[in-house]
Each structure stands twice: as structure tokens, then as C-alpha cells.
Amino acid sequence: MKQQKCNYFPSLWWRGREKGLSTFLFLLLFSISLHAQRQDILLNNNWNFRFSHQVQGDTRRVDLPHTWNAQDALAGKIDYKRGIGNYEKALYIRPEWKGKRLFLRFDGVNSIADVFINRKHIGEHRGGYGAFIFEITDLVKYGEKNSVLVRANNGEQLDIMPLVGDFNFYGGIYRDVHLLITDETCISPLDYASPGVYLVQEVVSPQEAKVCAKVNLSNRAADGTAELQVLVTDGTKVICKESRNVSLKQGADILEQLPLLIQKPRLWNGCEDPFMYQVSISLHKDGKQIDSVTQPLGLRYYHTDPDKGFFLNGKHLPLHGVCRHQDRAEVGNALRPQHHEEDVALMREMGVNAIRLAHYPQATYMYDLMDKHGIVTWAEIPFVGPGGYADKGFVDQASFRENGKQQLIELIRQHYNHPSICFWGLFNELKEVGDNPVEYVKELNALAKQEDPTRPTTSASNQDGNLNFITENIAWNRYDGWYGSTPKTLATFLDRTHKKHPELRIGISEYGAGASIYHQQDSLKQPSASGWWHPENWQTYYHMENWKIIAERPFVWGTFVWNMFDFGAAHRTEGDRPGINDKGLVTFDRKVRKDAFYFYKANWNKQEPMIYLAEKRCRLRYQPEQTFMAFTTAPEAELFVNGVSCGKQKADTYSTVVWKNVKLTSGENIIRVTTPGKKPLTDEVTVEYKEDRPL
């Protein structure tokens, strides 16, 4: 593929044209809207669905996104349906589209998709979490209805990541489907379903930013020339513009590179200021725009220090992170935009500034929201090991290895321009037994650096071994105080590892404990993780103790609670019901924030004054003397029992206020906490003290 290198000199067009920027921007955007030829049509409605074992007449109408496992998998059926589902739709192709180029883009089908146009097989995609695209320009009948058939298969495969996982493998077309219509000469969408544009941040500082815009062009028209323009705006004015005339041979695909030089840039600065420029890349012929693509540009620079942690734009930034699976009650993984928005709103309420989107690429809209809200993101491929289970996460065969590389390239190219993404994750909980994955992970690491030298790689480990010394960053999944041991074990592990390997950039990729909001106890006892009893107060204690250990160790570059939300795992038989991993800080339906949520909110979100009385769901008390606890952003709080003050207590370093040996009277007791000041905050609950505990 022919390439043109970047040279960082201000273009002649730009010199002396600082005046009249607003007028120019208005006219330019008007021109774009007037002449832009690309169309993006959603094809989500009116699909006919049937399983392969059903006859043609058994179809039912569905709209996308859709999964056929929203009921059985979420009911905890370990044998939930894993097989082939057929989706068919009549698509009318307008006669005026003749002479254009047509593409079918799928944002996500799990995990194999075979696509047919008018019953002719046009292609297959293997992998359930990345987007893919097929050109159908010469495969459709213009002025007629065409059949689009997709055979989705979520059956077990030995050559597609992931092989295993502590989550559900929902089947279906669970993300959007698009029909893209472009000019014969276009910015190519065919490069692994990427935008066709890569904004490479080669040098970024408070003084200047040098960005190389790499643009894939595709031409089916006759030989000719076109003008390629790249325009950077800040929302109100043009910051810089570059253009170049390019020669295009018929049938050619070329890569053009244009330099962008921005003086004194406004940086993308996490949650504090998630500012992004907008970059419009457009193609012009004969003075008319024939195609355009717009991408975000969030300029930032960052690094991780083995002793001091993560730095964004030269300033230390403790990463207060969570992990997130992409499913929820009743809909499985077939999420709509409002579901992603609600998840992010809950994270921001809690004070989250980092996220690990586990264990696979998630919806583009989710990455868009991470950009918008300034949440530092760890994005990863679904290279998932067995964890505590008996299956294999790696099979050393060529087809599996190639599939993993394909999914890594898809992840990086499709999401390259998201400023929130700061880490590419390569694996989770692999084991060095049998087929040893070490050499393959080295290949993945080299591929990631080849695709994107600007971002560090990372991984999530749960054991010792050579796997921990491949990626630039390393993090561990730790459950000290849940799967046995105590929270103190985490401190021992971190200190020992940092001392033994001071060169390692150490993070915590998972830590958490299960909790049911229906399981309450007025004494603190560690439960069995595999049992049916998952008391909420143990989860709260677990997070309080683990967070104290983490916060006292600045060398830990980032920590990610497992998990922000309860999620589906059909094989689990524990907690208050089967089929749910209940380690979330919020329930599966997003309706209830657990107590540990408020502990983190008090510690991470100092912008929102709050007080929260813990263990309010524990309404029955059997101990005559109780300990009450509140989480607050205030320096102190006062406790009242039945209107009588039990005294004021100072909040500790971790925003927690505790009153011990509080006596209750038989029957109902009104417990209230309040903060001092002219605008006091209060929280209260009524509990019942019973002298006789049921057997």
C-alpha cells in the first residue's frame, strides 16, 4: 500500500488566515452538510428470527439488538441455548444508489456470523465482540427487495476466543447493523471495520501537539485525482487545516498521511476536563465533497512509574477504577444506548475515573462515553483463562492463534482514536500448564506495539510465572478475604512483589466480594464464597479493608473493583439465586446501590456532599449493643437513637464514622445520622431489636 509520510510544517493555506475563523467554520460546515454523500442507515428493525432446528414458518419478528439467551441464561440454566440462530430481513435497495458503494456493517454478533445476500454466502466473521463489514455493491439487485440472512452461532468453538469465561456467551445480533452508502471514491471502512482514519499522537505537550492523520482511501472510479482535507476544530473555531491532492488509480487502496500541528493545545485531562477537538476528514472532487468522516481528538500524554503510579499530562492521577461486563437483567447483552448511559451515570456518581471493560471489546458508544466523561480506560481482547475452573483458555493451534491476532487488530483499529483508552489488555488469568501461552502472549504483545506504539500493553494475572513479565504493565486479580485468607494478605502480596520486582508496574485488575441485598446479619462473619449466604456487610468490610491497603501504596498504578454491577454467569450456584455473579456494587437491574458503593462514593467523589448510614437493610437486630457506621464527605457526624444523641464522631481518613456499643431498646428504634452546619445532611432507618434470635 502506498504511503505518504507526515511533515510538520504549517500549511500555506493556514498562514495569515487567523481572522474570520467563525465565519469560515460556518461556511465550511454548511458546505459539508450540503455535499456530504456518505449515508449511515440503521437496519435494526423488522428481522425474522428462528433457530436452525425450526422450520421456515416458525419465525418470529424481532428488533435489534437481540439475544436469544435473555431468559434461559439469566435463569441460571447451565445448559442455556448455544447453537445457531437465523436472522433474515428484506432490504430494499434504491435504484438511485446504483453507482455508489454499499457496505453492511455489524457492530457485534456472537460469536460466528455467516452472512448471505439473496441466499448467496458473502462472508464469515469469527469473533463475538468486534465489528465487521462486507461490501455488497455488486451483490444486490437495485430497485428491488433483497434478502439479508445472518446465521449467528454461539456454540462452543476451539479456535475462537474466548474458550472459557465466568460470564455468559449470549448468542445473537446483539449490537446495531448498518448500511453504509458512499461515493465510488471513499475513506475506506474496510480496514477491519475501522473508521479508516487513525490520529496518531506523535508528540503531545502543553506547548504543542504533533499529530499524524493516517487516512485509508479506496477508489472504484476511473483514474483521477481528489483533494484530501483534514480540519481540526475546537467547537467554535478552526484550529488547523491541512490538505493534499492525491492521485487515485482505479481499484487502488492507498494510505495518505497528513501532519497536524496544534500550538498550546487544550488537553484531554480525564474527569477534570475531558476536552476533545473534532477532526473532519473529507474527500473532494471538482470542488464538491464526496465523503467525510469525523473523529474525536483528545490530546494527552501519560506514563506509569513503578514507584509512583499513573501520571496524566505530567500530574499524578490515582486511578479509582471498576470493571464492567456488558449485560444486565432482562436484556442480557442486547444493550440500548440508555443502558450504557445509566451505567456511566452510576460510575460518575461513585467517583470512578478509570474502568476496565472486561473481558472483551465493548460497544463503540461505551468508549464514546468514556471519552466524554474523561474515564481512563483499559480495553482488552477476550483471551480469558480458566481462572478457578477446569477448562482451558489457550489451545496451541494455528487457527486459535490467528483468531486472537485478528481480534486484537480489530480492537486496536476500531477504537484507536478514543482518547480514553490508555491500555491495551492482552489476557486474563491464563495458566502455564499444558499448552503454554507464554510465547503466544509475546507475539500478541509485539503485534499490539506494531499496531499502536503509543499505548502500553497490560494484562490481568492470578499467579506467578513468566506471563507476568511480558506486557509493559501488569496487574493481578486478588480476592483476599473472599476466596479464603484475609484482606491483610493483599498487603503482604503487594509489598513482597514490589520489593522482589521493583521494575514491575503493578496494578490490581480485580478485587471484590459477593453480596446479596437480601442477606443481612448484625455480626461480622466471613461467609463461604461458594455458599448460598452472601451477607452484604461482609462485602462492605472487604472493600473497606482492601481499599485502605491499596490507598496506602502509591506504587499501585491502578485498581479496578470487580465488579461495578452484578452480572450473569449461568454456571454459578451461590448467593441468593443461581446464575448471577453478585460481586457488583450495584444490583444486576441497576436499581439498588449496595453499601460498598457508598463507601467508595464518600472516598472518591468529594464534589458531592453526602452521608450514608450503612447496614440500613439489616432491619432485625439481635445484639443489645450495636455498632453503627456511616460514610460521609463531612469531617464529622452525630448519631441519634430515638432522638437521643449518642455523640459526635470524627470521620477517619477513609470517610467513615463509627459509633460502638450503642444500646437499643426492645422493639423499634429510629437511627439517624446527621452532619453539622447550616445545611446538615441526614440519613436514617428504623430497626427492630429482638432479644430472641430465631434458630
UniProtKB/Swiss-Prot annotation:
InterPro entries: Beta-gal/glucu_dom_sf, DUF4982, Galactose-bd-like_sf, GH2_Domain-Containing, Glyco_hydro_2, Glyco_hydro_2_cat, Glyco_hydro_2_Ig-like, Glyco_hydro_2_N. It catalyses: a beta-D-glucuronoside + H2O = D-glucuronate + an alcohol. D-glucuronate binds at N428, N477, Y483, W562, K583. It is an enzyme of class 3 (hydrolase). GO terms for biological process: carbohydrate metabolic process. Keywords: Glycosidase, Hydrolase. The active site is at E429 (proton donor). A motif (N-K motif) lies at residues 581-583. SUPFAM superfamilies: (Trans)glycosidases (SSF51445), beta-Galactosidase/glucuronidase domain (SSF49303), Galactose-binding domain-like (SSF49785). The keyword Transport does not apply. Pfam families: DUF4982 (PF16355), Glyco_hydro_2 (PF00703), Glyco_hydro_2_C (PF02836), Glyco_hydro_2_N (PF02837). GO terms for molecular function: beta-galactosidase activity. Its EC number is 3.2.1.31. Displays beta-glucuronidase activity with the artificial substrate p-nitrophenyl-beta-D-glucuronide (PNPG). Is likely capable of scavenging glucuronate from a range of chemically distinct xenobiotic and endobiotic glucuronides present in the gastrointestinal (GI) tract, to be able to utilize these diverse sources of carbon. As part of the GI microbiome, this enzyme would be able to reactivate glucuronide drug conjugates, such reactivated compounds can significantly damage the GI tract. The N-K motif seems to be a discriminant that could be employed as a fingerprint to identify beta-glucuronidases from the large GH2 family of proteins. Belongs to the glycosyl hydrolase 2 family. This is Beta-glucuronidase. It comes from Bacteroides fragilis (strain ATCC 25285 / DSM 2151 / CCUG 4856 / JCM 11019 / LMG 10263 / NCTC 9343 / Onslow / VPI 2553 / EN-2).
